[in-house]
Swiss-Prot record:
It catalyses: thymidine + phosphate = 2-deoxy-alpha-D-ribose 1-phosphate + thymine. Transmembrane segments: none annotated. The gene is deoA. It comes from Vibrio cholerae serotype O1 (strain ATCC 39315 / El Tor Inaba N16961). PROSITE patterns: THYMID_PHOSPHORYLASE (PS00647). This is Thymidine phosphorylase. Gene3D superfamilies: Nucleoside phosphorylase/phosphoribosyltransferase catalytic domain (3.40.1030.10), Pyrimidine nucleoside phosphorylase-like, C-terminal domain (3.90.1170.30), Transferase, Pyrimidine Nucleoside Phosphorylase, Chain C (1.20.970.10). Homodimer. GO terms for molecular function: 1,4-alpha-oligoglucan phosphorylase activity; thymidine phosphorylase activity.
Length: 448
C-alpha cells in the first residue's frame, strides 16, 4: 500500500471517527469491504463500533454505512420475475406476541403486492417469525433462491430466513457489537436493520417500531429517534420507507409462544377470532404498505381493501399457498390443529388478588416463554414449539376468580408452576391504569 493510500488504513478511519470527524463515503466503503473480506480484524470492528457509539454518525454517514453493508454481499434483483405489482415489506423491532408478519404478508399479497420477507429468529425476550413458522411441519425457511422467487410470484408472499450471502458484513459487525456493549446505538441499529432488508431488493418498506415495556428501545423518545433515523436513511438509500410507532406495553396478540401464535394467526386470517389490538396494528402496517406501493390512494381506501381480502378468504388462501409452496402441509389452513404441537398441560393461571390490570412487564413475559423452552438463551438451543401462553388478559380488564391472567401451555407441573409464578409477578393487579394507543403515530419521509 502506497503512502497516498494511508488515509485508508482501518486504524486511521477508526482514529478519525474516535476524534469526532465525519467520515467520507469512500472511507466507510473501504472499512466495510474489509469487514466482508476479513482484512479488518475483530478488534478493529470493536473499536470502530465503540467510536461510533460515543461520537455518533451524521445522516450522510449513516446512509453510506447502510449502503456499504447492503452491498457487502448479494443484492436480490427481482426484475427477471416480471412481478405485476410493487415489491413491499415490513420490519418490526420485535416484541412479545408480535405475530403480525404472518397475517400482513398474505393480506398485502391478496391486495396485489409482492412480499419477499427475509425474517429473523427470536432475540432475547422477543419471539422470532422464523421460529413460529418452523412450528409448521415441513416448512422450509432456507429454500433455494429459485424456490423463494417462485413462491413469492405464486403466493404473493414468502417468509424465509436470512442467507449468508445477504449483508455478510452486518453479520460480523453485529456479532462483535453483541459482545462489546455497542448494540444500543441508533446509527449502528439503523444500518444493521436496513442493510439486511434493503439487500432483499425492496421498492418500499414499512418499519414497525415498538414502544413500551416490551420494546427494544427503552423510552418513547428513543423509539421515535430510531424510527426517524430509519425513515431518513432508507429513503436516502433509495427505498421508500414509512415508520409506525406501536404499543408494546402489553402482549400484542392474545398468545405468546410459537405454535400458539401460529394458531392465532390462522384463526385471524379465517375470521374465527381477531384480537382487536392485533387487528389495528396489522391494519396500520398493511395500509402504509399499500399506500407506499401505490395499491391504494390513502390509508382509508387501503383499509377497505384489506378488510375485503380478510372477509372473502383471499388472505387466508395466500397464507395456505405460501405454506404449501415452502414445504408445509397443503391443507394447513383447514386443519392447522392437526399439525401444530400441543402441550400436555393447558390450564389457566389466576391473579393472587382481584382487581384491574394496570401494567404488564412485557419483557418479563417474553422471558417466561424463553424459560419454558419457547425461545433461545443461546443460539444452539432447540425450541419447544408447544409451550407458551394464550388467552391473555388485557390492560384495563378486571382479574378475578372468573377471569384468569392467561392459559399456560406447559409440558409438566413444575414448568406450569414456574410459568404461573412468572406471570403473576409480571402482571400488576390494582393501581391506576393509564390507557395507551395501539398506534402512536406514523413517520413519513416528509417528517424527517
Amino acid at each position: 500500500m502506497s503512502l497516498s493510500q494511508a488515509k485508508y488504513l482501518p486504524q486511521e478511519i477508526i482514529r478519525r471517527k474516535r476524534d469526532g470527524e465525519v467520515l467520507t463515503n469512500d472511507e466507510i466503503n473501504f472499512f466495510i469491504q474489509g469487514v466482508a473480506n476479513n482484512t479488518v480484524s475483530e478488534g478493529q470492528i470493536a473499536a470502530f463500533a465503540m467510536a461510533i457509539f460515543f461520537r455518533e454518525m451524521t445522516m450522510p454517514e449513516r446512509i453510506a454505512l447502510t449502503c456499504a453493508m447492503r452491498d457487502s454481499g448479494m443484492v436480490i434483483d427481482w426484475s427477471h420475475m416480471n412481478f405485476d405489482g410493487p415489491i413491499v415489506d415490513k420490519h418490526s423491532t420485535g416484541g412479545v406476541g408480535d405475530v403480525t408478519s404472518l397475517m400482513l404478508g398474505p393480506m398485502v399479497a391478496a391486495c396485489g403486492g409482492y412480499v419477499p420477507m427475509i425474517s429473523g429468529r427470536g432475540l432475547g425476550h422477543t419471539g422470532g417469525t422464523l421460529d413460529k413458522l418452523e412450528a409448521i411441519p415441513g416448512y422450509n425457511i432456507t429454500p433455494t433462491n429459485d424456490v423463494f422467487g417462485k413462491v413469492t410470484k405464486q403466493a404473493g408472499v414468502a417468509i424465509i430466513g436470512q442467507t449468508g450471502d445477504l449483508a455478510p458484513a452486518d453479520k460480523r459487525v453485529y456479532a462483535t457489537r453483541d459482545i462489546t456493549a455497542t448494540v444500543d446505538n441508533i446509527s449502528l441499529i439503523t444500518a444493521s436493520i436496513l442493510s439486511k432488508k434493503l439487500a432483499a431488493g425492496l421498492e418500499s418498506l414499512v418499519m414497525d417500531v415498538k414502544v413500551g415495556s416490551g420494546a427494544f428501545m427503552p423510552t418513547y423518545e428513543a423509539s421515535e429517534e430510531l424510527a426517524k433515523s430509519i425513515v431518513a436513511v432508507a429513503n436516502g438509500a433509495g427505498t421508500n420507507t414509512t415508520a409506525i410507532l406501536t404499543d408494546m406495553n402489553q402482549v400484542l396478540a392474545s398468545s405468546a409462544g410459537n405454535a400458539v401464535e401460529v394458531r392465532e394467526a390462522v384463526r385471524f386470517l379465517t375470521g374465527e377470532y381477531r384480537n382487536p389490538r392485533l387487528l389495528e396494528v396489522t391494519m396500520a402496517s398493511c395500509a402504509e404498505m399499500l399506500v407506499l406501493g401505490k395499491l391504494a390512494k390513502d390509508t382509508a381506501q387501503a383499509r377497505e381493501k384489506l378488510q375485503a381480502v380478510l372477509d372473502n378468504g383471499q388472505a387466508a388462501d395466500r397464507f395456505g399457498k405460501m405454506v404449501a409452496g415452502l414445504g408445509g402441509p397443503s391443507d394447513f389452513v383447514e386443519n392447522y390443529d392437526k399439525y401444530l404441537a400441543k402441550a400436555e398441560i393447558i390450564r389457566p393461571v389466576y391473579a393472587q388478588q382481584s382487581g384491574v390490570i394496570s401494567a404488564m412487564d412485557t419483557r418479563a413475559i417474553g422471558m417466561a416463554v424463553v424459560g419454558m423452552g419457547g425461545g433461545r438463551r443461546v443460539a444452539t438451543d432447540r425450541i419447544d414449539y408447544a409451550v407458551g401462553f394464550d388467552q391473555f388478559i388485557r390492560l384495563g380488564e378486571i382479574a378475578d376468580s372468573n377471569k384468569p391472567l392467561a392459559m399456560i401451555h406447559a409440558r409438566n407441573e413444575e414448568q406450569w408452576q414456574q410459568a404461573a409464578n412468572a406471570l403473576q409477578s409480571a402482571i400488576k393487579v390494582g393501581g391506576d391504569y393509564l390507557p395507551t394507543p395501539d398506534v402512536y403515530r406514523q413517520i413519513r419521509a416528509q417528517d424527517v
